[in-house]
Curated annotation (Swiss-Prot):
Pfam families per record: DegT_DnrJ_EryC1 (PF01041)
Task performed by this protein: Catalyzes the transamination of 3-amino-2,3-dideoxy-scyllo-inosose (amino-DOI) into 2-deoxystreptamine (DOS).
Pathway(s) this gene product operates in, as recorded in its UniProt entry: Metabolic intermediate biosynthesis; 2-deoxystreptamine biosynthesis; 2-deoxystreptamine from D-glucose 6-phosphate: step 4/4; Antibiotic biosynthesis; gentamicin biosynthesis
The protein's name: Putative L-glutamine:3-amino-2,3-dideoxy-scyllo-inosose aminotransferase
Highest rank taxon of the organism: Bacteria
Catalytic activity: 3-amino-2,3-dideoxy-scyllo-inosose + L-glutamine = 2-deoxystreptamine + 2-oxoglutaramate
Required cofactor(s): pyridoxal 5'-phosphate
Amino acid sequence: MTQKLAILGGDPVRTRPWPEWPHVGPEDVDRLRTVIESRNLGGIPFPNTMHQQFAERFTAKLGAKYGLLATNGTVTLSMALRALGIHAGDEVITTAFTWVGTVAGIVHVNAVPVLADISDDNWCIDPVKVEEAITDRTRAIMVVHLGNQVADMDALLDICRRHNLLLIEDCAHAHFAEWRGRCVGTIGDAGSYSFETSKIMTSGEGGFLVTATEEAFHRAMSLAHVGRKEAPYDRFPGRVFGWNHRATEMQAAVLLGQLDRYDALDKQRTAMAEMLTQGLVEIGGFKPLAEDPRVTRRQRYELLFRFDTEAWDGLHRDKVLEAILAEGVEFEGNTFYPPMHRDELFHITADDWPAIRERYGEKIEPDAFHLPVAERVAFDEAVWIHHSLLSVEPEDVQDMLDAVVKVRDNLGALKKSL
């Protein structure tokens, strides 16, 4: 394939629009119409009718004991921490390679985030670095199951048992992924899921909390319900000062449809991911991450590849992805997740969050951390392929592969243009 690259003025491989996300059907419109015509749109009574339907079904599909739908995935992380007894000044160790919402969930309860580096194998938090980060103020680990990966839960559970720490799972990317046959989110003390607009299941915004502990669940219900302590969700001591994080009936109505079509879309994504992965391996230059056999079901919110700069004649990832994008195919790099401590959104000051002062002073500065793997992966190696590019047909996957081949076949021209 020697056609002129689109980035140099040629015609792109792909000009047709990609399938739209999210998938919406007439049954979704009917369900929303039912809500609107009922005039019962909000979060009261709590939990409301469709809220309760979705919560029961989603919790059961996960194999969890208790589950709560809330306004978004960041607040369900905060609710999990507070419901489990995390207080101001407690340190929570989390990954350096994540969205800012993970850290916000910690900071918003006035706890202290501690970033640990990632494993080079799966780009999730490195258990060795977690153990090195533990102090006498550490109370919890917040693990993120990233992209299409699952963190090493065996090692993290062992650390938590030996050090008497809580384990909270951020499953924003990992709805129904499994570790040794158990859904992630149900393995630690609590799990949190996101239904933000880009996620595999979406209601525009939304979050979900699961736990196996009745007391923590009831406390979380109170936290979401402005601190009300009402039967039958009142089996916890004392009171909490809550928020209003009640999900609306409209969010729940949309999510019921998302859940109905989940398995069919997952089957399609899996087949297209396998086709795309095989094709990229044959082309060269994009290496899939190793697959841990303990991950018994893998999700594909983002398909992750390691960019091999040598295979691209020394060109940096970002220049290659720019050329592929010009061909009509969006593979993302550093624009998806920079390392957390280098993210412009990572702006945490003691004026706003005084609990950080003892460890960090007046502001958490980027140089408070040494995170070489996260920096290398984020700035040079990580390639992210969004699940919307997997909810497609084989001819669409072929367009992706053709775009990559075209750029590979025209590397010389691309290098000369720099």
